[in-house]
Regions:
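Short alpha-helical
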Residues: 20, 49, 94, 115-116, ...
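Substrate-recognition/cap helix-loop segment adjacent to the acidic, metal-dependent catalytic center
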Residues: 30-32, 36, 53-62, 85, ...
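Acidic, Mg2+-coordinating phosphoryl-transfer loop and its flanking beta/alpha structural elements
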Residues: 163-204
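Structural signature of beta-strand start/N-cap positions in the alpha/beta core
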Residues: 4, 102-105, 161, 181, ...
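Active-site neighborhood of HAD-like aspartate-dependent phosphohydrolases
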Residues: 1-44, 55
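Structural recognition of alpha->loop->beta junctions
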Residues: 125-132, 194-211
Length: 214
């Protein structure tokens, strides 16, 4: 095998989380009398953490203190509703089982709240993901490479033996900043041009295609 570890993004890569994210965003917005956002708007807002998601979702020129209150409502609601509509993409479970059977270590590095990320990974992929790192105090979020370095240290794997898999420009830049290759996936929240423009080393159309590069 070329690599000893595969590090995955979560939203748009392993799981389709848009509906649960949209529902929690709209619940939070409704508590402040703000208009709802549609699925495509949420799709374009995700990738840079929940604070950025909420700040883009509230109306323009919303005072920061109101945005922060809306964020708190979102966090509480999403922590309790993160697995209602969310589901793994077809073929992901088969890929993770194949990696495990071949002794490849796996991890998730995501800008999602750490508690929600752990809940989703445990609910859908219990025993198939070795390490999960979401938003944690003291660990800079993507595209900074801190989360990648953290999981490599926990897994005991060097950068030369790891690859990152994601669906967005944030993932491509994260991999580049960490000094590891990036496999871009076509079933997520961004299109092929975004992945190419941001330097994905490989682009795949199906989850099992990832194994060909491992």
């Amino acid at each position: 095998m070329k690599y000893d570890a595969v590090i995955f993004d979560l939203d748009g890569t392993l799981t389709d989380t848009l509906e649960d994210l949209k529902n929690s965003v709209n619940y939070a917005l409704s508590q402040f009398g703000f208009p709802e956002r549609n699925t495509e708007e949420i799709r374009s807002f995700v990738g840079n953490g929940v604070k950025r998601l909420i700040y883009l979702s509230v109306p323009e020129n919303t005072p920061d203190e109101i945005s922060e209150s809306c964020l708190s409502v979102f966090r509480e609601h999403y922590n309790n509703h993160s697995c209602e509509k969310t589901k793994p993409y077809d073929g992901i479970a088969d890929l993770l089982k194949l990696l495990k059977d071949n002794g490849i270590k796996t991890a998730v590095v995501t800008n999602k709240m750490h508690s929600a990320a752990e809940d989703i990974v445990k609910y859908f992929f219990d025993g198939l993901i070795d390490v999960t790192v979401g938003q944690i105090d003291g660990v800079a979020q993507k595209p900074q490479p801190d989360g990648v370095y953290r999981v490599l240290d926990l897994l005991g794997v060097s950068r030369e033996k790891a690859v990152y898999v994601g669906d967005s420009e944030v993932d491509c830049i994260t991999a580049k900043n960490a000094g590891i290759p990036c496999i871009g996936v076509m079933w997520g929240f961004r299109d092929r041009d975004v992945l190419i423009k941001n330097g994905a080393d490989y682009i795949v159309d199906r989850p099992l295609d990832i194994f060909d590069y491992i």
